[in-house]
Amino acid sequence: EMSRGLGDVYKRQTYELFGGKDKLCEPFMAAMEMIHTHSLIHDDLPALDNDDYRRGRLTTHKVYGEAMGVLSGVALLNRAYEVMLSAFDLTEDKDRVIAAMRIIADKTGINGMLGGQSVDVENDGKPLEHKMLDYIYKNKTSALIEASMMTGAVLAGASEKELKVVEQAAENIGLAFQIQDDILDVTSTQEELGKPIHSDEKNNKVTYVSLVGAPAAASRVKELSDHAVELLDDLDRKNGFLDLLVESLVSRRK
């Protein structure tokens, strides 16, 4: 699971990478946090992952009931777009705001997060090969990081060519993040993660670890994160903190 606020950090750092200095990205940071939280609330519902704990606390539906879990998730998604619309009041460059909203709508909808989640549900308990697993991961997790980093870039005035590089880097970061999640599910503790471990095995989920083993999965995480750093460095724009953030994926414990 992407940590609370991590997408915001990627968005802010990418915004600053391309010279953004004002508050234009802030409504989008808040909106992405709402969209991410909406996805987690719904993921935890009995109809999907049926998880009781998230971030060390009881999940929304365990505290407030299943109906409120559904409604609060939808409310957050709706509120996210209300908040993004407020960005029109912060700039004369309306085209950048429109472009950012289009990216988020695309990356979190059927072509991204929700599409990946749907394919994941349809294949629950079925044997999967690398190609299908990559598709699910790229859409469920990478799409959120792509949305965060690409909106940061476009709001700061990145070119189409630069935006493509950011998209590729973010895809690598997202895949690395999700594979590291698979590794932590079998190597970490519930106290460290703040949620039950071995949940993938319990739910008969195919993961990178179940396909290739933890050592090979760890090598893949390093390969993907190294490639992401190379892509970002090739932009000839320096943000050492962003590089450090990507590299920390390899060693994270939660």
Language-model-derived ranges and their functions:
Residues 14-48:
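Active-site cofactor/substrate anionic-group-binding motifs, chiefly glycine-
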